[in-house]
Amino acid sequence: MCEPDDNSARNGVTTQPSRSRELLMDVDDLDLDGSWPLDQIPYLSSSNRMISPIFVSSSSEQPCSPLWAFSDGGGNGFHHATSGGDDEKISSVSGVPSFRLAEYPLFLPYSSPSAAENTTEKHNSFQFPSPLMSLVPPENTDNYCVIKERMTQALRYFKESTEQHVLAQVWAPVRKNGRDLLTTLGQPFVLNPNGNGLNQYRMISLTYMFSVDSESDVELGLPGRVFRQKLPEWTPNVQYYSSKEFSRLDHALHYNVRGTLALPVFNPSGQSCIGVVELIMTSEKIHYAPEVDKVCKALEAVNLKSSEILDHQTTQICNESRQNALAEILEVLTVVCETHNLPLAQTWVPCQHGSVLANGGGLKKNCTSFDGSCMGQICMSTTDMACYVVDAHVWGFRDACLEHHLQKGQGVAGRAFLNGGSCFCRDITKFCKTQYPLVHYALMFKLTTCFAISLQSSYTGDDSYILEFFLPSSITDDQEQDLLLGSILVTMKEHFQSLRVASGVDFGEDDDKLSFEIIQALPDKKVHSKIESIRVPFSGFKSNATETMLIPQPVVQSSDPVNEKINVATVNGVVKEKKKTEKKRGKTEKTISLDVLQQYFTGSLKDAAKSLGVCPTTMKRICRQHGISRWPSRKIKKVNRSITKLKRVIESVQGTDGGLDLTSMAVSSIPWTHGQTSAQPLNSPNGSKPPELPNTNNSPNHWSSDHSPNEPNGSPELPPSNGHKRSRTVDESAGTPTSHGSCDGNQLDEPKVPNQDPLFTVGGSPGLLFPPYSRDHDVSAASFAMPNRLLGSIDHFRGMLIEDAGSSKDLRNLCPTAAFDDKFQDTNWMNNDNNSNNNLYAPPKEEAIANVACEPSGSEMRTVTIKASYKDDIIRFRISSGSGIMELKDEVAKRLKVDAGTFDIKYLDDDNEWVLIACDADLQECLEIPRSSRTKIVRLLVHDVTTNLGSSCESTGEL
C-alpha cells in the first residue's frame, strides 16, 4: 500500500524546495518511494509564505484560480474570472472548468484581473476551495504507485534516447466528486536545462486540469481528447489550433511552443488508458514517427503500451491487377498535374487489416498511420505507388499524409469515399482537426482548394481508389476554380482506360454534365454540403473552355459526415439511394485537321492544346497521327542553337573571314513541309500549294532552298510558377509519359500510316508514350540564312539538323568540313563552278580533324554554373562544358553524400519541362541552354531511383 508520509500528513507541511530546482525537475529528483503526490495538501501557517508553486491559499485574500473552483452542489452557480468569452464558460452539465490560473503572479507575467471581473467575483462573494481539496487518485493506490514508478523510468529511457530540446510530461487521472480529471501536477516529467521557455510552459501546465468525460473541447483540451478517445493527436504547430481546441494557446504563443504530440498510455493488457504522455517542442515538427517509436519503446521497457508504430515487416502486394490499376492512375495524375500545373496529386486506398482484395487474392496494404483507430475497420491510407508532386515545397505535406489516415467522411477524400463519387472544397483550412486530421499541415503548406473523386478499375473489381488533387493556392476566384475543375475532368476523361467512377455514374452522360458534392466547413463543426453539376466540354474541339460552369442543385445538409447515409443527388434534384450500375463506356471522338493544327505552330504545344480544348498528351497523339513527331516551335530553338554553334566553328577556321555570312539567314531557308499531305503552309493564300521539290522524297524531313512561306514570330512560353520542381514516385516507364530530348536509341518508332485525308479521327486508348519530335519546320525570324552556295548540296543536311539538333556530337556529324585548316582553299566555299558542289562537303583530311580536336576554341572550354535541387537541399557548383554525365553525377554525389547510382538527374529545358539526362548527348544539350536563353544557370532536379511499376510486388515502405 502506498502510504502517505506521517509527518507531512500530521503537520500539513512539506520541506521547502528551491524554485529553480522545481522548475527544472527531472525524473532523477523524484522520490519513487514516497507517497502519491495528490494524497496530501501542503499548507503553511498563515504567518509563513507559500512554499510550493502548487499551493494556493483558501483565504479570501488570495482567491484560488477558477481552475480549482469545484462546486459541491453539482456545478450550479459557478462564476469565474477568466478573460474568455462565452466559449470559455463552465459547462453547466459537467461543472468542471478547465481554464488557466490566469492571474496568479507566481506563474504568469500577465496583468491583474480587470475591474469588472473583480466586481463580479466580489458581488457573488464566492469562496474558492483549496485546489487540491478532495482531489485523490482512484481507489487502487497500490497500482498507481507502481504505474507512477514505471512512468518515471520510461521517461528516463526516453530522455536517454533523444537529443532534442523537448518537454515530456505525464497527465494522470484524479477524481473529484466522482468526476475523472487529468492533471500533470506531481507527475514525472523531463526537461532540458536549456528549455528555451519550456520550463515556464511546464509551470503553466501545472495550473491546468482537463475533464475526460465532457463533450466540450474547451474542457477536454488536448490531453482530455487523447485520454477519452484513446488515440494520439499531434500537430506541427499548436498555433494552428483555435483557442477552443487548445486552451493553453495564449501561453504557447508567449513561450514559443510549436510542435506537440500527445500519446495515450495503456496498461499491459492494452484495454485501459491510464494516462497521457505529452511531448512539447519549440520548433515545428512534421515527422513524428521517430518520436512515437522512442516513446513506445520506452513504455514497452517498463511493461506499458502506447499507440503502436507500424515497424512490422512490410506487407507485400503480389497482385498484377492492382499494379496495372495503379500504373494507369499514376498516368492520370501525371498528365493532370503537368497539364494544369497542380502542386500535388495523390491516391488514397481503403485499408483493412487482414482483409483480402476482391480480385487476385493479394493482401491489402496495412495503414501506415500510427493512429490505431483503424484497427478492425476500414480507413484510407495514401499509397506511395501513385502520387505526383510538382511543387517540391509540398513534399512535407505528402510525408505527413503517410503518417495519417482518413476515415469515411474526413476531409475531401473521405467524403468522396463516403458517397462513392466526387467532392470539392474551396477551402480545406476551415475544417477542425476532427473533421480533417491534416488541416494543420494544409495550413502549414498553404494548400486550400481540393478536389477528390472515387474511382474503380476493371482490373480490381470493386476496390476503390480515391484520387485527391490540390489546386494552386494562387487561384482564389470561384469562377476560375470552376473552369480549372472542368478542365481537370476533361483531362481525366481522356486518359481513363479501365477506370470508372465508383458510384457507377459515367463521365459525360446526361449532356456532358457531372454531378458532384461541394462541401464547406461551418463554425459550429458542421459541414454544409450541396450537390452541383458541372458542364464540361468533353467534345472539347467544338466547345470553348469558358463554357464550363456550375449548375446549382438542391442543398444537402450534413452534420455527421461519418455516420450519414450514402445518398446521391441526381441532376433533377431527386435524392435516391446509390445503385452501382455497370455502363458501357465509349470513347469520345475528336477531329482536328492539319490545316487547323498548322495555325498554332508558332506557339508552344501547351498553348495550342489549351486553345483547342485538349490536354498536351492528346495534342501529341494528334500530332503523331499527322506524322509530326516534334512540335515545331520547340525544335526552332534547337535549330537556332545548332546554327549558332555552326557559325562559331566556321568563324574559328582560319582564312574564312568574310567568306561566309551567317547573320543574314532568313526564314525562307528552312521551310516546314509535309511529304504526304497537301496542307497549305502558314500565311499562304487560300488555295495556294507549296512548291514541289525536285526528287520528291516521302520522308517527313525535307529541306528547300527556293520557295517557302514566312512564319510569324512565336510567343515564348511563360515559365511555370516559382520554385516548382517536378518528380515522380515511380520510375518513368511502363505506361507513363517520357521526357523529351533523351539520348539516341530510346525513341519509340511508331509505324507511319499515310493519311490522305487532312481531317482525321482520334479514338481508342490514348498513347502512353510520346517520342521526341523530328518534324522540320520554319525557323523564326531570329534565325540565320545560309548563302545558296553553301546550300548547293543540301541533301547532305537533310534530316541531320532536325533529328537531334543541339548537341555537340550532332554538330560534328552535321558539318564535318567545319574542322579544316588553312590547307583548304577558300574557293571550296565561294567558287561558282558547278563542280564546287561536289567537293563542298568532301570529308576533310584526317590531319585537319586532328588539329582542330587538339586546339578547341575558348567557347568549348567554358564552365557552366549548375544549381541542383534534391529534396530540401540545393547545391551549386560549376562544371566544364565538355563534361560527361558520369562527371556530373560524381559532382552531385560528392556534394549530396549519396551514391552515384542511386539517383537520376533532369534538367529544365527551354519549354520549362524537366527532361531526363540519360547520356552525354543529353548533358551537352543541357549545357547549351545558357547560350540560347537569358538565364546564366542550368537548373537540375535530382531524384532517387524508385521501384519500377513493372515489378511483381508493391512495398508500402516504412515510416
Curated annotation (Swiss-Prot):
GO cellular component, one term: nucleus
Species assigned in the record: Arabidopsis thaliana (Mouse-ear cress)
Subcellular location, record wording: Nucleus
GO biological process: nitrate assimilation; response to nitrate; response to water deprivation; stomatal movement
Disruption phenotype: N-starvation phenotype. Smaller rosette, but no effects on roots. Delayed growth and flowering when grown in greenhouse. Increased drought resistance.
PANTHER family named among the record's database cross-references: PROTEIN NLP7 (PTHR32002:SF33), PROTEIN NLP8 (PTHR32002)
The name this protein goes by in its record: Protein NLP7
CDD domains tied to this protein: PB1_NLP
Function comment: Transcription factor involved in regulation of nitrate assimilation and in transduction of the nitrate signal.
Summary of the tissues where the protein is detected: Expressed in roots, stems, leaves, flowers and siliques. Detected in root hairs, emerging secondary roots, vascular tissues, leaf parenchyma cells and stomata.
Keywords: Coiled coil, DNA-binding, Nucleus, Transcription, Transcription regulation
